[in-house]
Amino acid sequence: MQILKDRIRKDGKIKGGNVLKVDSFLNHQMDIKLFGEIGKEFKRRFADAEVNKILTIEASGIGIACIVAQYFDVPVVFAKKNQTKNIAGEVHTTKVESFTHGRVYDIIVAKEFLGKGIFRKRR
């Protein structure tokens, strides 16, 4: 997506450990117009897919996920980085490495919010 590449080249900064810092437009301060363009691009690329949810991880991914979900008219589900008292019942868990935080998280999503066949093409 050229608009995102251009924005990264313009405002992104490379930090130690090859970390790309994009906090001025993606994950601390959010450029909603840019998010809208990203949402349009996801809709274009997955127009033939039967999308029923947008899944992301808590924190940085939520903003973009919400805009993308508007284009598909579907809910957003986000994986939590910590078990909380209000997540009851069966859950999906996996480990995810955060390069920016330098640690591994055990992320959690309640099974009730995910269904079978997360991705399949429309016929």
Language-model segments: which ranges?
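Active-site-facing substrate-recognition patch
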Residues: 1-51
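Short glycine-rich phosphate-binding loop at a beta-alpha junction
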Residues: 51-58
